[in-house]
Structure formats: C-alpha cells, structure tokens
C-alpha cells in the first residue's frame, strides 16, 4: 500500500512479470525452436508462444483511462488520499474543525480514518459532490491534496480533470 492510501501498486508486479517472461521464458523457447531441425511447426509455434508471452506482459501494464471527476473510482482514489492525509496531519484537521464547527463530514470518512484495515468499502456510495466539497474545503487542498490526488490517479492509470 502506498502512503497515499490508494491500494496496491501494480507497477512493481507488472515489471517483475515482464522481466520474468523475457528472461526465463522467451530465450529458452526461442533457442529451442531455432535449434530444433526436425519440426518446422514447433519452431513457428514456439516463436509465436514467446511473442505472445511478451505481448501478454506488455498488456499487463496498467491501462490509462479517462474518467469523469464524479466517477466512483475517482472518488475512491481521492478519498483514499484524503484519509491518508488526515491520518498524517490529524492535529491540523482537528484545528481546522475547531475553527469551522459547522463544517460537516460524512461519518464514513471518520470511520475510515480510525480503522486501519481496508477502508475502501466504507467509502463507497458517498456522493461525488460531497467528496469534492470536503476535499477542496480545506486550506491545504491546492498545496498538498491536489498534487497527491493527481499522483495517485496517475499511478492508477486514471486521467481526469481535478477541481481547482
């Protein structure tokens, strides 16, 4: 889990898969196919299998997706960053809450902050406009949250307009 709270970093496992396929599978099959003089079909099949394995490794890389800012997947990434930021700067959030006592937050966010397990399911169903309101309502949104959200979305291969 990354410190932004967005989940598993798929980039690392993808690189390992590609390296494994390229280093272990492809050269052995290619050399075997090229040195086997008895069956031309084996040569073509083995080469095709090696190429398919490399293509599968490349296809396993995270695809990029353009989503609406109100898409629930975008909201979950934003809320994951927000929960992680609250955990990292709890005193600052307490001071902000004390200065703005009428500012309300969904109860699911408070539960996620203090539950250090998988909080993703707790945060589903919060309306997009409420997510935007609570995240952009803090003074450090543009300096701390927006860059972290942008980075987290990018790591997940998600591109969208982020509220300014």
Curated annotation (Swiss-Prot):
A single BP term in Gene Ontology: fungal-type cell wall organization
GO CC term (a single one): fungal-type cell wall
Top-rank taxon, per record: Eukaryota
TM ranges: none
GO molecular function: structural constituent of cell wall
Sequence similarity: Belongs to the SRP1/TIP1 family. Seripauperin subfamily.
Protein name: Seripauperin-21
Annotated source species: Saccharomyces cerevisiae (strain ATCC 204508 / S288c)
């Amino acid at each position: 889990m990354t410190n932004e709270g967005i989940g598993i970093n798929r980039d690392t496992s993808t690189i390992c898969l590609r390296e494994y396929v390229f280093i272990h599978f492809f050269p052995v099959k290619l050399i075997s196919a090229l040195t086997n003089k008895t069956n031309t079909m084996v040569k073509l099949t083995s080469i095709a299998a090696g190429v398919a394995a490399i293509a599968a490794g490349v296809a396993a890389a995270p695809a990029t997706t353009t989503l609406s800012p109100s898409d629930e997947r975008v909201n979950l990434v934003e809320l994951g960053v927000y929960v992680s930021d609250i955990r990292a700067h709890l005193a600052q959030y307490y001071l902000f809450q004390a200065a703005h006592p009428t500012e309300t937050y969904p109860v699911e966010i408070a539960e996620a902050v203090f539950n250090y397990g998988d909080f993703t399911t707790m945060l589903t169903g919060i309306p997009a406009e409420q997510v935007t309101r609570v995240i952009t309502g803090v003074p450090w949104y543009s300096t701390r949250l927006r860059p972290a959200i942008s980075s987290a979305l990018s790591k997940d291969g998600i591109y969208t307009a982020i509220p300014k």
